[in-house]
Amino acid sequence: MNRHHFFSTPAIFFISTLFGLPGCDLPSPTPDMFYKFDVMSVGKGPSYLLTTDLNLDGEPDLVTVNTKDSSLSLLYGKGDGTFHTARNITVAAEPTMVTSGDINRDGIPDLVVNARGAEMIIVLPGNGDGSFRKPIPTRTGKVPLNVILADFNNDGKLDAAVTLTFDEMEIFTGSGDGYFHKRQTYSTGSRSFSGVAEDFNGDKKMDIALAASSSSASSIRVFLGNGNSTFQKPKSYAKQLVPLAVILKDMNADEKPDLVFATGKGDNLFMLYSKGDGSFSKPISFSGGGGPFALTVGNFNPDKLKDVAVANSRSSSFSLVTRNANGTFHYPTRDYVVEGGTVLAITSGDYNHSGMSDIAVASNFKNIVEIYLQRRSFK
């Protein structure tokens, strides 16, 4: 065989037809929509990022979970894309994630931290000025991985679902004063580092979807709630895809909560469209980056369709995946190399009052957070 003429004429014609471009041109990547605006130092080993308003000033703030020095870094937003120098606070051993909610019903956001090494979740009651009162710990089972807040028994108080390393999920009911009380334990069939809560079947009872990632029994597992802090037997979707992270967003504007998830099996992302009855479509695959690990959804271009940004742990980058007019995802992705490498966390918000979604990523290796602002005109 002539090695200099590997592709035959029919093969070249097929590839050219596939891409719909003369001369077999490859498709262009997503436009360059972001530019690096700021870099900030945080604690050691940032592994999770949260956008929230800690001090109720209307400006989005950032919280990083720093696993290596068991701390949180609080970055208060100025509203122009910059943030004040991080304030670091020590929490219990090996925190892995943080979420926010009004746990004690005083109208002020509180933080709830999952502390893997201490085997507990910790409530940090907010004062409304960005500071916090004495932590309130709640003991969990062995090696907690993730905490999900929602009102699971319809009493107007936030409850917590905590996933454990050894394939279990514990349900804690909230008493409305910052304290939680254990109620039920469920088998998940697989460890879960990520999950979300929403009413998937329209019965006004909160349900749970978990990214169950153990390779032998991996799937997206959906637990439909009974409205009294108990749940039905889970249903599994996207089996054997090893989902690592799952987020919730209405991706097709039908007012039903859809699921987008990253997997440990290849570099693709997947989406499950909600049918509104508690069930979901077959997984729809689209391209991610090198080692997709964490996700955020926002309007990352002017077309009003929900787009996806993914943190890539293997390629030290994050990738932007925008939508086409027909709802499909653009290929190839636009990739942004992160200075500090080892990107484990990503979040988004309007950090400069531009009316457009911006992106923050955390480098686990160099202990920094990078801010990327959206361009008004794209390259």
What are these regions (language model features)?
Residues 10-20:
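Bacterial N-terminal signal peptides
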Residues 24-44, 76-93, 125-142, 173-190, ...:
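Blade-edge motifs of beta-propeller repeat domains
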Residues 41-58, 62, 67:
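Beta-strand-rich domains and repeat architectures in extracellular enzymes and scaffolds
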Residues 47-56, 76, 96-105, 125, ...:
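Beta-propeller blade termini
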Residues 58-60, 107-109, 156-158, 204-206, ...:
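Glycine-aliphatic tripeptides that mark coil-to-beta-strand junctions in extracellular
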Residues 62-66, 111-114, 160-163, 208-212, ...:
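Hydrophobic beta-strand segments that make up the repeating blades of beta-propeller
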Residues 68-70, 117-119, 166-168, 213-217, ...:
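Short glycine/acidic-enriched loop and turn motifs that connect beta-strands
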Residues 344-379:
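Blade-level signature of beta-propeller repeat domains, shared across WD40, Kelch, NHL, RCC1
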